[in-house]
Amino acid sequence: GKVTMGAGDVGEILATAAGVHTLDQWAGAWRAMAERLEGVARRAEVGGHCHSAGEAYLRAHEYRRQSYFFARDDLDAPDLLEAWEAQRDDFRHALRLLEVNHRMIAIPYEDTELHGYAFIPAGAGPHPVLVALSGYHAPAEEMYTVAGVPFALARGHAVVVFDGVAGVEPQTET
């Protein structure tokens, strides 16, 4: 699913996995691949290749997310928060460069807000709306591929994704 929607490349995934022999190596391997792709994306954007840059940022977003996937002991750990913010930033760069029609949203919940995105298909509405929320380890950004947002938009469906109440702590940031 994620590779089909552009959030991964089989060659990059296999190359990254080949360097992982222990759980301790996991975060560093995925972080390195994400950083490599962020560089590719920056150079592509500077060169005027915005779509290619957006594709690289989308993959970097997923690889950043992979880098902290197993980090559950300390949700306030600086490395986790840094990786979370980087995956969010990469995702937002991808949306902008790929020209994905969206709005950032905040849904009131108890004494906080659940942040997410509303994706709107081309054409006049009304549009059927799909609502997808993330779970404990899935930020709203990951739901872009998990919920099949590109496929839904292509079929005229609007999609709302948002962090769940048990999501990673930075869910309350925009």
Model-derived segments and spans:
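Generic hydrophobic secondary-structure signal
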Residues: 25, 58, 63, 70, ...
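Short, surface-exposed, charged/polar-biased interaction segments
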Residues: 74, 81, 108, 151-154
